[in-house]
């Protein structure tokens, strides 16, 4: 029988637009997502497939927030050490693999910024911010904006899974 192969060379055009297209397509499908019913956002193409390290980090974050299957289609022999570190971020992968299996919902969109909220097992939540604008941006994350009631007995702790920073 024949053996099928695929080409892992870098494409001539940037590929992050396809990541954003898949992300946008999958957002309204979250209501169908649960263990046993996974929305397939497509392959992880980061690392050597015509994407920057920042775009690779964004794709892994988005796919993890969507509880998507994490299937890498990049050429493993050509991944930089930085790309391997990004794609192997255990904390971000744990968000994807959380046993609750729920997909994030879009809680805020504006000025090129999306804020996603994903319920996790144990009553925790993951929050991700996507800058799909053309330059640097910032967003103020207030509990009410993220869907949390402003109560005195509510205590919030935040961890940056990419930078390691912690804030209470």
What are these regions (language model features)?
Residues 40, 52, 80, 89, ...:
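Helix N-terminus capping/helix-initiation residues
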Residues 63-66, 71-73, 109-150:
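Carbohydrate-binding surface patches
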Residues 1-75:
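Glycan-recognition surfaces
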Residues 58-108:
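Catalytic cores of secreted or luminal carbohydrate-active enzymes
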Residues 144-164:
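Solvent-exposed beta-hairpin/edge-strand motifs
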């Amino acid at each position: 029988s024949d053996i099928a192969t695929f080409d892992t060379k870098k494409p001539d055009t940037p590929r992050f637009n396809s990541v954003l297209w898949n992300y946008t397509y999958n957002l309204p499908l979250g209501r169908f997502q649960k263990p046993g019913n996974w929305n397939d956002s497509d392959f992880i193409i980061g690392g050597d497939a015509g994407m920057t390290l920042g775009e690779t980090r964004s794709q892994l974050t988005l796919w993890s927030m969507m509880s998507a299957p994490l299937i890498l289609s990049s050429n493993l022999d050509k991944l930089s050490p930085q790309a391997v570190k990004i794609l192997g971020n255990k904390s971000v992968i744990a968000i994807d693999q959380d046993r609750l299996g729920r997909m994030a919902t879009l809680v805020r969109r504006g000025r090129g910024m999306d804020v996603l909220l994903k319920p996790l097992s144990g009553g925790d939540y993951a929050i991700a911010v996507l800058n799909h604008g053309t330059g640097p941006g910032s967003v103020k994350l207030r509990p009410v904006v993220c869907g949390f009631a402003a109560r005195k007995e509510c205590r919030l702790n935040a961890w940056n899974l990419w930078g390691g920073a912690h804030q209470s």
